[in-house]
Amino acid sequence: MSKKLFIQTLGCAMNVRDSEHIIAELSQKEDYTLTQNLEEADLILINTCSVREKPVHKLFSEVGAFEKAKKNGAKIGVCGCTASHLGDEIFKRAPYVDFVLGARNVSKISTAVKTPKFISTDINHDESEYAFGEFRGSPYKSHINISIGCDKKCTYCIVPHTRGDEISIPANLILREVEKAATNGAKEIFLLGQNVNNYGKRFSGAHEKIDFSDLLVRISEVAGVERIRFTSPHPLHMDDKFLEIFSQNPKICKSMHMPLQSGNTKVLREMKRGYTKEWFLDRAAKLREMCPDVSISTDIIVAFPGESDAEFEDTMDVLERVKFEQIFSFKYSPRPMTKAAEFTNQIDEATASARLTRLQSRHNEILDEIVAAQEGKILDVYFEELRANGGVAGRSFNNFLVQVNGSEELLGRTLKVKITDTKRMVLYGELAN
């Protein structure tokens, strides 16, 4: 009789793909099937994030709830980035946890579920970490890792300590996975890496040397692939070749994530980001010039240690000049093992909160203007989700969330939609064809 697996995923798209890898491994080798019912689960997993302090606190509140809800004999496992940096401390704080797997150790999940108090948190450079069977959370798109880890060592970021140095996955393995996904019906390919456009700088062995721009072209040539998305690129590596291929290739979706973090050059230097305010503005302007329909999203940290009022105003200036379609903004959160956590000039909570509120309020005003301008336009929308209110939703080519009245027969299809109404985060429309 098949065993039941319940899995909760916190954090980024990399974690989503790691969870898909875990599900594939357990279903193929250990006869587990996925369940959404916690109470019937034989195995309960939480795949964790540690990029800020809040998700770490959430881990322990969640596993505490799992311990109360689990049926007799059910096992609880903690995976992901928090597992990497806390290690066996998780057992001390939550003794009912049965095993701990770091972010670079998910290939050991079969061993973990069969071994009492199993723990593995070392940085694994073995190619087994990305040679998993196929499982997709959505039949209409496929998340595919092209690299693992990060070399940037930004002073605020824990990721290099939890996911290790950057290793590119060989192009032949990526293309094989793309072909498999397309054959199985995924028309959209979503490429993942901490710095995707740094792809090709280091492999774990002797492999074909290829950069990210050329990899995008190769993937676009795979039969059945209609759309390509990726996250996250680094502004430092947005050279003209990359921007040209992004702008001109008809299969690459016209949405670009450009993580700003700060609009002040001094703060960027202390963050160890490697670029200046002027470089970022130049790349954003070049992108909008080459690709007028592009939507640009970004990450912003306010109240980085030592950030003055004037330096924060530089961030507001970039917000005004680029007019991002979407921002992911947070107060600086000190992380263990990072340089910035040792800085003595931390910003007080009141100042940090005020800056975040101002940033988000102004962006909401910008977003309202951007969204209102979509009304009356006809957008190509790839439908992939049934909504609870009875509609069908998908993403436009430039990443707007669009909803229409319809049924599941629309899923997996790209159709033209005329936008008839707008809300801050959703466009509403009717089929134009």
Swiss-Prot record:
Question: Residues in domain MTTase N-terminal?
Answer: 3-118
EC supergroup of this enzyme:
transferase
Which residues hold [4Fe-4S] cluster 2?
Answer: C150, C154, C157
Q: Which Gene3D superfamilies match?
A: Methylthiotransferase, N-terminal domain, tm_1862 like domain
Ranges for domain TRAM = 372-433
Q: Which reaction does it catalyse?
A: N(6)-dimethylallyladenosine(37) in tRNA + (sulfur carrier)-SH + AH2 + 2 S-adenosyl-L-methionine = 2-methylsulfanyl-N(6)-dimethylallyladenosine(37) in tRNA + (sulfur carrier)-H + 5'-deoxyadenosine + L-methionine + A + S-adenosyl-L-homocysteine + 2 H(+)
List of residues binding [4Fe-4S] cluster 1: C12, C49, C81
Q: Domain of life of the organism in this record?
A: Bacteria
Localization: Cytoplasm
Enumerate the spans annotated as Radical SAM core domain: 136-369
The record's listing under InterPro entries reads: Elp3/MiaA/NifB-like_rSAM, Methylthiotransferase, Methylthiotransferase_CS, Methylthiotransferase_N, Methylthiotransferase_N_sf, MiaB_methiolase, rSAM, rSAM_horseshoe
Q: What is its EC number?
A: 2.8.4.3
Q: How is the cofactor bound?
A: Binds 2 [4Fe-4S] clusters. One cluster is coordinated with 3 cysteines and an exchangeable S-adenosyl-L-methionine.
CC cofactor: [4Fe-4S] cluster
Give the principal location in a single coarse category.
cytoplasm
Q: Report the sequence similarity comment from the record.
A: Belongs to the methylthiotransferase family. MiaB subfamily.
Query: Its biological function?
Result: Catalyzes the methylthiolation of N6-(dimethylallyl)adenosine (i(6)A), leading to the formation of 2-methylthio-N6-(dimethylallyl)adenosine (ms(2)i(6)A) at position 37 in tRNAs that read codons beginning with uridine.
Q: How does it assemble?
A: Monomer.
Question: How is this protein named in the record?
Answer: tRNA-2-methylthio-N(6)-dimethylallyladenosine synthase
